[in-house]
Swiss-Prot record:
Protein name: Antigenic heat-stable 120 kDa protein
Domain of life: Bacteria
Protein's organism: Rickettsia australis
Keyword DNA-binding in annotation: no
Disulfide cysteine pairs (residue numbers): none
Length: 991
């Protein structure tokens, strides 16, 4: 790259400016892009700046998106939230301040992203007020710069990161216009998308900086960031540098960027998931073409995105549940002079208007013969338009043509479609025509139908371009604010009818158009309008000339779109139920298709049930009129309802797990939580109709909820014990108590926490088995059993004693029914048999618990194992001769090894500390004592003759030894041990 001064002096000013944009200096910031192939297993680089902030929760597959979220987006949200809390403290309306404070704090606990708070329009005033603070702006700017710097340095192709950021290679400007493009490709050469960049030359307008200084904007650029990507699979990131007020790129050390993050979606295609840009982003006007700008380092920079494109991108981010939120501001009051764009900024994607006129006069081969419009648009009109009303030249030409007649508009469109072979250019023409029709109050519906038919039947278009063209028309219908929803519904029905009944489209293209129409229908303003639209589309499918099989396929596509939408479960259930009903009544859906759609309905119903039960439990816990007993009984009833519901076992388990988490994470005190979980265990164990297998599965789910809840370990242990206690309130099954341990194993709890929870479960199970065994014997009058080998024989003594009591009683009451001694003995024997059976059952329970599979050990056994392990670790430590080896041993075995219990690690550390202290004491007492078992040179060693008998011999040897302890190294080891102990104790205190 070269500087401007190095270009030949003959280059005129305009060419020099374009060359400067195309050929940045080495110091100049550049646009970049990154692409990671689908399901890439490339590991995230280890960098110190990101290692402490990027979590390992696995929620984000793409490392760049994850890094941006956790080092830029979320920290910026947190800083804004902190400033809002400061502002609330000074708010006069204390009720409102307290309400908003609670809203922020509660959402922080539930969802640390704060997306709901920032996405709530009611909070916008608070957010804008916070963004006015200069100190906050500095913090946000610092976060943006530091975060992007680390991301770019880490994920850069030049540093060996596969698919990392590399410069965008813009092609030369197209003809004499200020339009240039680039085809973005991955490392394999596959095309990802085509980016078009337009340099906009404006009559100067000014914007105000924060200090009131006016800055003149002479030039900026627009880039048509893609909304959908459907070519190559994977994740892509487009990072475009912001331009200075004069339209040139800044140096790298002052650069800021507008970055679009496209993350691999469920189908493998990149989806627009996040947008990262400086905060706050402002727009110079309220029109869709208003340019974005920011103040950075006291300077004004323009970003390569317009207000319309930004809003469209943010809607896509919201659709894919990204964490970015729209914090942009429309700053019309900052504009001191806003002129329309000059003539050269309106770059037709096809040709200039003069060329367009000649093309219209040329006969075409399309079905509609061309008719020259009565008048062509004037260039001067374009230059006089206010900026807020700027449109692209195609739209202006289309609107002018439509002012004559719809036939004139078709002539204009068809002439362009025939002349231009590029699909994107053809789509832009169709899109402009649709916009012109919808902006005209006359005959919208009829003209949209004509345009759609013309698009579907136009031989100048490829099948894929036809799909894209019709979808562009549908997107225009969706975004048009001046068309009532009822009229939009009729347009959707007509579009679907044209597509499905066309002989020029394959089934695949027909389905793509249908799916887009359904998407538009699902985005109408209210549920009534959406229902009318989907019902109309369904009826259109049924009435079409497709085969019954193809009709069924299309209805399934409608159902899939409804099922995948972001609507509430209740509305999805209504819409899907209507499609299914119509498909069954008209015999369009096959039995298999009916079953598939019914499965979707069942899943929605199950989700509704799950959410309803969770909401019900939340209401019970929050009800101030309920004491602990009432809450326990109410949640037991909810548990029973879940167990009795017809939903699948998987959903039942998820529901029970969610309910348990709600209880465990509630603000109730620990004992109240224990009582409620105990009640849930009792409700499951005592259920009358559930099979043992179903009960076991339910118990596992409850314990998984306990183990995964965000609460203190001690509370989890108490709730686990409570669950086992609840099981034992009914007749306990050993497999049911083992289910508690399996629930722990299935959870995502930490390994050391899992063992603690399983130990708690085993402890209470053993205690309850002992209690039940004693209780069972006491109930049969065997409070103090004699030491006999056979309990049955022992109990016969009781039977003999009974005879001496029964006979006198019967003699004294002859009116009673006589009972033979034989009958009495039979009855007594039956009772004793019951006692024996009870005893055998309890013994078997003990055997099951004490079997090798149960992992149940006595306290003495555990202590012995721990002592043995401590001795082994101390002995192994003694084999490490160097300080470095000893430090590595401490880190690997005592700090990082979570498979060892906390007690074993702490005992080992204590024992090693004692040894180090003893060695140090000996060294201080006898500093000159040496050992000669290791050949290490010591400062205290000395040369001695080989033989005392021949002192003249000069040949000597070095008697080498080592000090008993090197004081400096001893201090290092003691420090490492104490750090390890602190780390273990601190990790125990984490929630």
């Amino acid at each position: 790259y070269e500087n401007d001064e190095e270009y030949e002096s003959g280059i005129d000013e305009k060419k020099q400016e374009k060359a400067a944009l195309a050929q940045p200096t080495l110091d100049t910031a550049d646009d970049g892009f990154s692409f990671t192939p689908a399901s890439s297993t490339q590991s995230t680089p280890s960098i110190s700046t990101l290692s402490d902030t990027i979590s390992h929760d696995g929620q984000t597959s793409d490392p760049i998106t994850k890094a941006v979220r956790e080092t830029i987006i979320q920290p910026q949200k947190d800083e804004i939230a902190e400033q809002i809390l400061k502002d609330l403290a000074a708010l006069v309306d204390r009720d409102l301040a307290e309400q908003k404070r609670k809203e922020i704090e509660e959402e922080k606990e539930k969802n640390k992203t704060l997306s709901a708070f920032f996405g709530n329009p009611a909070n916008r005033e608070l957010i804008d007020k916070a963004l006015e603070k200069p100190e906050l702006k500095k913090k946000l700017e610092a976060i943006e710069i530091a975060g992007l710097k680390n991301v770019f340095l880490t994920y850069i192709a030049a540093n060996g990161y596969s698919g990392g950021f590399k410069p965008v290679q813009w092609e030369n400007q197209i003809s004499a216009s200020d339009l240039r493009a680039t085809v973005v490709k991955n490392d394999a050469g596959d095309e990802l998308c085509t980016l078009n960049e337009t340099t906009v030359k404006t009559k100067p307008f000014t914007v105000a900086k924060q200090d009131g200084t006016q800055v003149q904007i002479n030039s900026y650029r627009e880039i048509d960031f893609p909304i959908k990507l459907d070519k190559a699979d994977g994740s892509m990131h487009l990072s475009m540098v912001a331009l200075k007020a004069d339209g040139t790129k800044p140096s790298k050390d002052k650069a800021v960027y507008f970055t679009a993050h496209y993350e691999e979606g469920p189908n493998g295609k990149p989806q627009l998931k996040e947008i990262s840009s400086p905060k706050p982003l402002k727009f110079a006007g309220d029109g869709p073409d208003a340019v974005a700008y920011i103040e950075h380092g006291g300077e004004i920079y323009t970003l390569a995105v317009t207000r319309g494109k930004y809003k469209e991108m943010m809607k896509e981010v919201e659709l894919h549940q990204g964490q970015s939120v729209d914090l942009s501001q429309t700053i019309a009051k900052d504009l001191t002079k806003v002129q329309g764009r000059s003539q050269e900024t309106l770059q037709p994607i096809i040709t200039p208007n003069q060329e367009l006129k000649s093309s219209i006069e040329t006969p075409t081969t399309t079905q509609v013969p061309p008719i020259t419009p009565d008048s062509q648009p004037l260039q001067t009109e374009t230059a006089q338009m206010p900026q807020s009303q700027q449109v692209n030249p195609n739209l202006l030409n289309a609107a002018t043509a439509l002012s004559g007649s719809m036939q004139d508009l078709l002539n204009y469109v068809n002439a362009g479609l025939t002349k231009e072979k590029d699909g994107n250019t053809q789509i832009d023409l169709i899109n402009a025509a649709a916009t012109a029709i919808l902006n005209n109050e006359k005959e919208k519906q009829a003209n949209i139908i004509v345009l759609t038919e013309n698009t579907v039947n136009n031989n100048a278009l490829t099948p894929d371009t036809k799909v894209a063209g019709v979808n562009a028309v549908l997107e225009n219908i969706k975004n048009n604010q001046n068309t009532p929803d009822l009229e939009k519904s009729k347009m959707l029905e007509a579009t679907v009818a044209i597509a499905l009944n066309s002989e020029n489209l394959a089934p695949k293209q027909k389905q793509q158009m249908l799916e887009k129409a359904v998407d538009v229908g699902l985005n109408l303003k209210d549920d009534t309008s959406r229902a009318v639209a989907i019902d109309g589309i369904t009826d259109t499918v049924i009435k079409s000339n497709l085969s019954t099989k193809d009709k069924g396929t299309m209805l399934i596509a409608v159902g899939d779109k409804v099922n995948a939408s972001e609507l509430s479960n209740a509305e999805k259930q209504q819409l899907l139920g209507s499609v299914l009903k119509k498909g069954v009544e008209t015999q369009v859906l096959s039995p298999e298709q009916q079953q598939l759609m019914q499965q979707h309905l069942d899943k929605i119903t199950a989700e509704q049930t799950k959410n309803a039960k969770i909401t019900e439990v939340q209401g019970i816990l929050a009800n101030p009129a309920f004491n602990t007993i009432a809450k326990t009984e109410a949640i037991q009833n909810v548990t029973t309802k879940v167990l009795d519901s017809p939903i699948k076992a998987e959903i039942k388990g998820e529901t029970l797990e969610s309910i348990t988490k709600v209880v465990a994470e509630s603000p109730l005190n620990g004992q109240d939580k224990v009582d409620i979980v105990k009640g849930m265990g009792e409700a499951i164990a005592s259920h009358k109709t559930m099979s043992p297998t179903e009960k076991i599965s339910a118990i596992e789910s409850v314990e998984t909820g306990v183990a995964e809840s965000i609460t203190a370990l001690e509370d989890k242990k108490l709730m686990t014990k409570g669950l086992v206690d609840g099981i034992y309130e009914d007749k306990a099954n050993p497999e049911m108590t083992k289910a508690v341990s399996r629930g722990v194993d299935k959870s995502t709890a930490r390994p050391e926490d899992k063992q603690a929870l399983k130990d708690a479960a085993s402890e209470v199970a053993l205690d309850r088995e002992t209690q039940n065994f004693t209780k069972g014997l006491k109930e049969q009058n065997l409070e103090k059993p004699k030491p006999r080998d056979d309990i049955y024989n022992k109990a016969q003594d009781v039977a003999e004693a009974l005879k001496n009591v029964i006979t006198p009683v019967l003699d004294a009451h002859p009116e009673k029914r006589e009972v033979s001694e034989e009958e009495v003995m039979k009855k007594t024997s039956s009772i004793l048999n019951d006692i024996s059976n009870l005893t055998i059952e309890k013994v078997n329970n003990f055997r099951a618990m004490l079997s090798p599979d149960s992992n149940l050990k006595t306290l003495e056994e555990k202590k012995a194992e721990a002592t043995k392990k401590v001795d082994e670790l101390v002995k192994e430590f003694g084999t490490k001769s160097s300080t470095e080896e000893q430090q590595s041993f401490i880190k690997a075995n005592l700090t990082d090894d979570k498979t060892l219990s906390k007690e074993v690690r702490l005992q080992t550390i204590d024992k090693l500390l004692q040894e180090q202290a003893q060695k140090r004491a000996k060294a201080i007492e006898n500093p000159n004592v040496k050992t000669e078992d290791v050949r290490v040179v010591s400062e205290q060693s000395e040369l001695k003759p080989i033989s005392n008998d021949e002192p003249g011999i000069e040949k000597t040897k070095m008697v080498v030894g080592r000090d008993r302890v090197n004081i400096k190294d001893n201090i290092k080891i003691i420090g490492a041990l104490m750090n390890a102990r602190d780390s273990i104790i601190q990790s125990e205190n984490l929630p």
